[in-house]
Amino acid sequence: MTVAATTELEAVNIMMAAIGESPVNTLTGTLPADVVMAQSTLAEVNKEVQSEGWSFNTEIDVTQQRTNGTNHIDLSTDVLRIDPNIHQHPTIDAIQRGLKLYDRLNNTYVFSEDLICTIVYLRTFVEIPEPARRYITIKAARIFVDRLVGDEGLRTYTQQDEIRARAILMETDYVNADHNLLRGDPSLTSIFDTYNPSSALIR
């Protein structure tokens, strides 16, 4: 039997239940202050978790093209982390500044070529897999209770619940990312030579 993935509305209602409040039927229109806060906390945690870079929101060898006339490289608003492939662009040290790439090595926003990059994107809640939704919901619910009530004894979810949910997410991400010793880790081409959540798992 297929189990439906957690929706954003369900996630918010889980958070509302954690403070003993009734569920809501919609997240549009004029909402109570605590619902708005729950929604904001969920979005905050969603961005925080996705910023780590997982298989579901990381794309490798993406060509970032220069803008005609300026030769600047403009970024979309859903880019969380980006880095050029150091093997293909050894003379460039580009970082994100606002919605542009900036070359720290040459002190300029102007690039002489398009760049091949590894990019972590911010996906919407409905685009991410269920283990990620579950972990984000539990983490957000715990933070929401702490902020609104401030009483650890009223927590519906404990830190252990959060740890277990993260472990499931990491295991799922490890499988989906095709990590293995023979083929290597496809995500370790540039920016993520230092860290990728599921690469921390000991097999």
Role assignments for model-derived ranges:
Residues M1-S40, Y195-R203:
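Short, extreme N-terminal leader segments that mark the start of a protein/domain
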Residues L27-G29, H89-I92, E113:
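N-terminal start-of-chain detector that recognizes signal peptides
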Residues A17, S22, E52-W54, T58, ...:
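Flexible, active-site-adjacent loop/turn segments at secondary-structure boundaries
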Residues T2-T6, A11, Q96-R203:
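Internal mixed-charge
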Residues L27, N57, E152-G153:
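Short linear functional motifs in flexible/disordered or boundary regions
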Residues V35-N107, P131-L148, Y157, R166-L169:
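Divalent metal-cofactor coordination and adjacent catalytic microenvironments
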